[in-house]
């Protein structure tokens, strides 16, 4: 075994996107019909009290943020057709989501870090945070998502 250092790629820096706002422009409302359909599709009964299924943490924040997935990828100079991959998603609920209630979505891009990958060649790790709140600002949840953006052309 050699004590030679592992060669590193001289990678160009990723786009400077940290701090870009992901605030939504209009409220997102979980309808009772949409919640019922989602619950039925996964084999659970919707609750009688109007509580929405917890997966709406992801649906509501993704749909309600100020960019589409393609737009978010584009800001990172990444073509959505090249296949972004979810690496992780963490959520902290302050209270349960309910149907019929409009929610505001705010958020921002936290970081975009470029690094070598044995499987992908080069990849960017995109981290962004989203918050969902009532119109009066009462927090409902906060989520942090990390996506892998494969940069095959840089490999």
Predicted region positions:
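HotDog/MaoC-like acyl-thioester-processing domains
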Residues: 2-15, 93-155
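Hot-dog-fold acyl-thioester-processing enzymes
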Residues: 2-88, 154
């Amino acid at each position: 075994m050699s004590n030679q250092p592992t060669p590193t790629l001289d990678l160009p820096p990723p786009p400077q996107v940290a701090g870009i706002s992901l605030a939504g422009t209009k409220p997102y409302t979980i309808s009772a019909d949409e919640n019922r359909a989602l619950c039925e599709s996964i084999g659970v009964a919707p609750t009688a009290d109007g509580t929405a299924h917890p997966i709406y943490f992801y649906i509501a924040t993704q749909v309600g943020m100020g960019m589409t997935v393609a737009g978010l990828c584009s800001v990172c100079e990444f073509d959505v057709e090249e296949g972004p991959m979810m690496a992780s998603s963490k959520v902290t609920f302050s209270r349960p989501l309910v149907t019929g209630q409009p929610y505001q979505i705010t958020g921002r891009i936290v970081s975009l870090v470029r690094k070598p990958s044995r499987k992908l060649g080069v990849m960017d790790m995109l981290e962004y945070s989203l918050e969902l709140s009532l119109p009066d600002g009462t927090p409902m949840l906060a989520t942090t998502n990390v996506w892998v953006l494969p940069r095959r052309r840089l490999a």
